[in-house]
Design a protein with these regions (language model features):
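Alpha-helical ds-nucleic-acid-binding substructure associated with the helix-hairpin-helix region
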Residues: 51-122
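Short alpha-helix boundary/capping elements
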Residues: 34-39, 51-52, 97-100, 143-144
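C-terminal accessory module of base-excision DNA glycosylases/AP lyases that mediates lesion recognition
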Residues: 1-15, 20, 114-118, 129-212
Length: 212
């Protein structure tokens, strides 16, 4: 991984770990849902402390699930849903062991195109289509992992100068800008919901009529 200093957890030690450890970054990405992103990306550092060792895919994959869940749930919990996230992270590490010889960085280092990189990431436990695109954008923008077509694979999150996702967070100010964008998108979606609900019966009626 490139020696770029990430600024996601907004904590010096946690961000240093994310910057140098590919597995820590992947785990942070998995945790980044339904909780503040700083909390999510603090998770890998707190997990290393609770496990008493550096993060290792083979080690986590082979641990007793209940033991791992306990490490996630110990206050302060690593996530709002520590049990399910512990299971998801363990599934992630098993894929890394089985498909990438235990080397998480191989997921992107051996991808020859952006499309291939996106497919690989989307196939990982804990990554949907949008999160996979965001991670491709993060790799390309901040870690200089730029296989051919990476921006196209990242979609809108790969746009230069955007402030749409964690791929664009480089300091406290950009974090605020990303938060404002997400807030605006959430408000827009909320406004659109009643209109869509109102239009649904009419569309259903029209479809039924045309099917006669």
């Amino acid at each position: 991984m490139a020696p770029k200093k990430l600024c996601l957890a907004q904590d010096k030690d946690a961000d240093a770990l994310l910057s140098r450890d590919p597995l820590a970054l992947l785990i942070g990405m998995v945790l980044d849902q339904q909780i503040p992103l700083e909390w999510a990306f603090m998770g890998p550092l707190n997990l290393t402390k609770r496990l008493g060792r550096d993060l290792d895919a083979a080690d986590i994959a082979s641990r007793d699930p209940e033991e791992l869940a306990k490490a996630f749930a110990t206050p302060p919990a690593l996530h709002r849903f520590p049990g399910s996230m512990a299971g998801r992270v363990q599934e992630l590490t098993k894929v890394i062991v089985d498909q990438y010889d235990g080397d998480p960085a191989a997921i992107w280092k051996t991808a020859s195109t952006g499309a291939e990189l996106l497919r690989r990431i989307e196939a990982l436990p804990g990554f949907g289509k949008q999160k996979a695109k965001i991670f491709v954008a993060l790799l390309g923008k901040q870690l200089k992992v730029q296989p051919k077509g990476w921006q196209e694979a990242a979609g809108e999150f790969g746009d230069d100068g955007s402030r749409k996702s964690i791929a664009d967070i480089t300091d406290g100010a950009s974090l605020g800008e990303v938060r404002e964008y997400k807030k605006a998108m959430k408000a827009k979606a909320k406004q659109a919901a009643p209109a869509a609900k109102k239009a649904a019966p009419a569309a259903k009626k029209a479809a039924a009529k045309s099917g006669r």
